[in-house]
Regions:
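Short secondary-structure junctions
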Residues: 62-65
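Active/ligand-binding-proximal structured segments within catalytic/core domains
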Residues: 27-60, 70-71
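Generic structural motif
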Residues: 18-20, 68-73
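Histidine-acidic residue clusters that define the catalytic metal-binding segment
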Residues: 140-164
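A domain-level signal for the structural core that forms small-molecule/cofactor-binding pockets
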Residues: 58, 118, 161
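Short coil/turn segments at secondary-structure boundaries
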Residues: 42-50, 68, 81-88, 92
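Non-catalytic terminal extensions that flank enzyme cores
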Residues: 1-38, 153, 160-164
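Active-site-adjacent, His/Asp/Glu-enriched structural segments that form or flank metal-binding
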Residues: 73-145
């Protein structure tokens, strides 16, 4: 089996920011990296779940709503994936994400936290979601990263493999 693209990123040098994870068939997958993998704690599951509800709500009501395909958390809980159609850049996503995070900080409740609307409606933490949002907002505004450090593998025979 081939190694999937996201596993070729050197997570030991990955900083919080926004990255293009992949582009294919007219879709762009953006990696919204909230925490520094393996250096900082992952986002707590309840806070991440709230962040997912809030970000999905905002993006699906934003100027980009017709281009939003998917908004959801990474399994490692260090960030979110947003899949878009159209010609969005990391700078476009930076602007949109900053607007989204600013909106999240004004919210007093998490949307769709009822048993009929959410499969785990009790797993939410708005205060911690806002804490993570504030920290990520600061990083996007003052310490923006958008280029992956690729993992390179060199075999014993000298052959080098790296994600391009």
């Amino acid at each position: 089996m081939e190694v999937i693209q996201s596993f070729t990123i050197d997570h030991t040098h990955l900083k919080p920011g926004i990255y293009v994870s992949r582009e294919d068939k007219g879709f762009t997958t953006f990696d919204l990296r909230i925490t520094e993998p393996n250096q900082e704690p992952a986002v707590a599951p309840a806070a991440m779940h709230s962040l997912e509800h809030l970000m999905a709500t905002w993006f699906r009501n934003s100027e980009a709503k017709d281009d939003v395909v998917y908004v959801g958390p990474m399994g490692c809980l260090t960030g979110m994936y947003i899949i878009m159609t159209g010609a969005y850049t990391v700078e476009d996503m930076q602007r949109l994400t900053i607007e989204c995070l600013q909106w999240i900080l004004t919210q007093t409740e998490v949307p769709a936290t009822r048993p009929e609307a959410c499969g785990n409606y009790l797993l939410h933490d708005l205060p911690m979601c806002k804490w993570e949002s504030r920290r990520y907002l600061n990083r996007l505004q003052h310490d923006f990263h958008c280029e992956y450090t690729q993992l390179q593998v060199t075999l014993e025979d000298g052959m080098v493999f790296a994600d391009a």
